[in-house]
Amino acid sequence: YTGNPYLIEYPDNVMRAKFETTYNLLKEKFGIEVKSHRAGRWAMDDRYFALLKDFGIEADCSHTPGVSWSQAAGETIMGSDYSKVQNYPSFINNILEIPMTIRKTHISRKGSFKHKLRVLLQGDNVWLRPASATADEMLHLCKCIDTEPNVDYLEFMVHSSELMPNGSPYFKDENAIEELYKTIEAVFAYVRQLGYKGITMAEYCRIYKNNN
């Protein structure tokens, strides 16, 4: 193991202190109660869910269905394995886990012929995330999920650093950022046509509890 440590690698007291520092900073800066959470580098365990409960967190979105981080090294462990987790919400220690929108598809409009053939035969995970999927792939993903009976949400992800030129490895200049915003606008326009509307994780959690 040669990577930076995951939060779940630390002893309970250190883990709590680190989380509390971030929690208090966000609460102070935004002036609201923090009710939703995503783990850094997607690493969760039972202790982490218990910690979220202690701080009044209601919703988490750290699970990545069909994706294993077991090749992503921490300092003493590898990353979490979500390859077998369900792709619809469920409660874990009274925290509503709202998995990231990811599905395996067999269509690819980018890459080499060899890559497209592999995706056609084996499938490939497509995220509702511009850093890892094209606009066409995300539109196709949304269309497919809209027909699923157990899922009534789409979870879109973008890091704030990805919204500025060279803030991330994915969008390095002004042109890339312009294309990113066009992609986001296209995806949002399409899902509005499907009947979706933008809400926070905490708002979705309240709706889910009322309906279940």
Regions found by a protein language model. Give the residues of each.
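Charged, low-complexity C-terminal accessory regions
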Residues: K29, V34, R103-S108, N212
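Metal-dependent polysaccharide deacetylase catalytic core of the NodB/CE4 family, i.e.
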Residues: Y1-A43
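Alpha-helical scaffolding segments of alpha/beta enzyme cores, especially the outer helices
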Residues: A17, T21-N24, R47, D54, ...
